[in-house]
Curated annotation (Swiss-Prot):
Effect of residue 26 to A: Abolished phosphorylation by ATM
Phenotype for residue 640 to R: In DEDHIL; no effect on protein abundance; changed proteasome-mediated ubiquitin-dependent protein catabolic process
Protein name: F-box/WD repeat-containing protein 7
UniProt cross-references to SUPFAM superfamilies, sorted A to Z: F-box domain, WD40 repeat-like
Biological-process GO terms, alphabetical: cellular response to UV; DNA damage response; DNA repair; lipid homeostasis; negative regulation of gene expression; negative regulation of hepatocyte proliferation; negative regulation of Notch signaling pathway; negative regulation of osteoclast development
Annotated ranges, domain F-box: 278-324
GO MF, one annotated term: ubiquitin-protein transferase activator activity
Low complexity bias (residue ranges): 57-68
Encoding gene (name): FBXW7
Renumbered ranges of WD repeats: 378-418, 420-456, 459-498, 500-536, 539-578, 580-618, 622-659
Recorded consequence of changing residue 159 to A: Does not affect interaction with PIN1
Compositionally skewed regions (Acidic residues) per UniProt: 87-129
Amino acid sequence: MNQELLSVGSKRRRTGGSLRGNPSSSQVDEEQMNRVVEEEQQQQLRQQEEEHTARNGEVVGVEPRPGGQNDSQQGQLEENNNRFISVDEDSSGNQEEQEEDEEHAGEQDEEDEEEEEMDQESDDFDQSDDSSREDEHTHTNSVTNSSSIVDLPVHQLSSPFYTKTTKMKRKLDHGSEVRSFSLGKKPCKVSEYTSTTGLVPCSATPTTFGDLRAANGQGQQRRRITSVQPPTGLQEWLKMFQSWSGPEKLLALDELIDSCEPTQVKHMMQVIEPQFQRDFISLLPKELALYVLSFLEPKDLLQAAQTCRYWRILAEDNLLWREKCKEEGIDEPLHIKRRKVIKPGFIHSPWKSAYIRQHRIDTNWRRGELKSPKVLKGHDDHVITCLQFCGNRIVSGSDDNTLKVWSAVTGKCLRTLVGHTGGVWSSQMRDNIIISGSTDRTLKVWNAETGECIHTLYGHTSTVRCMHLHEKRVVSGSRDATLRVWDIETGQCLHVLMGHVAAVRCVQYDGRRVVSGAYDFMVKVWDPETETCLHTLQGHTNRVYSLQFDGIHVVSGSLDTSIRVWDVETGNCIHTLTGHQSLTSGMELKDNILVSGNADSTVKIWDIKTGQCLQTLQGPNKHQSAVTCLQFNKNFVITSSDDGTVKLWDLKTGEFIRNLVTLESGGSGGVVWRIRASNTKLVCAVGSRNGTEETKLLVLDFDVDMK
């Protein structure tokens, strides 16, 4: 009989097996199936007998076994079919199902409330990858469903039976592959799964569906949706089912599915499908699971956190996010006051908050709304010659002989530092200490909190044009062609460095060596302790205006249009960087990347290890006049110009992003003299030389929620 059933099943599979589509469990397909049930319920009851009669007719030609086993088996199948139909029509079963749905709805509301914050965080990241995956999934389902009807005869394509079964039937996947993990928010367990006895582990390969449930930590016994009494003969039919071979069981299941209504098929899908969604992460030790998640990009990690509660706990791991922050150069966690009480089991990650905040800040720099900046008015119509910005404190120096201390938060002038008898042309700041150099040939050390002048440093015989502060010492360069090393705590001059024959224009100090550039075309490297010149770097053919020093390389910019890279140990010139057409007025060096601004209105990005020009910031949006100041970080380059604009560029691509500041008087006298930027704020010193723009500071804040 088994072989005969197999032959009949093969025949049915050739004629009707391909009718089985692959209905999705999505909401659209569920509504479609429910609509079919509601509209055709009466018609299905009438067609039920016709379908059974048609199936019985196909088996008529099969030779029955002795003892009427064929008739008995057919009766049991009909009895079980009627039992599945009666379950869906049972009112008490529907009522219990409704109560269970209400209970799950309450649990879902609570879970949604817990995950609301995670959803908001994820929405801040680009969702294009998810959209493309959904499109690909939709296309794959469409191709699969289309291919399943290629070999159908014409009369079956047009039959009502085909229309009905393609909506309600699902072809079983008997392969060994496990379903891919879904994107839904489904709770998953984490434990060392054991068998129902609790004594021995489950087998590595589950042999029954109950074993599979046990392997998933859910127990072999499912919670039933109805309390109706089992039909007569059910246990005998199950015993007979267990006695059949694997192919015979598959054939019986196919026959059973053919006789089910859409709601019954839907129930089977809801029971079976989740068991093949194995959560491999929850089966791993926590340390190994975190190691796996560490390979995800931050935006993908936020998406993974929405998969289930256990994944969310893993995705909140503070050390995991600390590594992500380290990769992005974020060196401090973010400690904020929580408005919501965190439920047990969920630990807030300060490092994750810091990463999300930094992502929001970067987005605001790129495309956030440019709200009206804070305007800090001062120094009347004088030129702001130097600008410092540290923490929440801004210090501006002017040729009106004063310095002003401002709050970057409120925009208020906290105090005015009065004492110089000439214009202030250089300054440095660290913590609460401010140092200024003036045309009155002195340096002054100020207390930023009180405005008190702590020391006045005498020694230079001309304007103090440049200085560099390192810890407790400051090195000053003067138009008297000398450099002096000072102790800012005692006010004493420790060393005098003499050797230049013209005004010193720029200086750098790393605590061990002093590097100076002067109008005598020379760059000198000094040992301040012995007051000796270690190297004189010769090569420029005009005045040296700018310097950078990272402890290994010296980079000098000159009026001769060239930039030279030197080895500080040997004094050799490693590279000569050419491309600019005029004076290199400003440079910044970080991690072998040099950004130079020039009076020819261009900005260039260089690799000083190779001497290669990586990018030239120009094009239709380039500056229209000399570049006055610049600053860069790992993502952006910020430049200011005599044309009255401040521009933002992409460091890696060199592409223009947008204008951050555009003066109305730009092009007719309005100038941006200096800029200083932190991670979250931009400070610009603006004014004019012809009275068209009032002297002031502009403060833009990018650490705000632009939504």
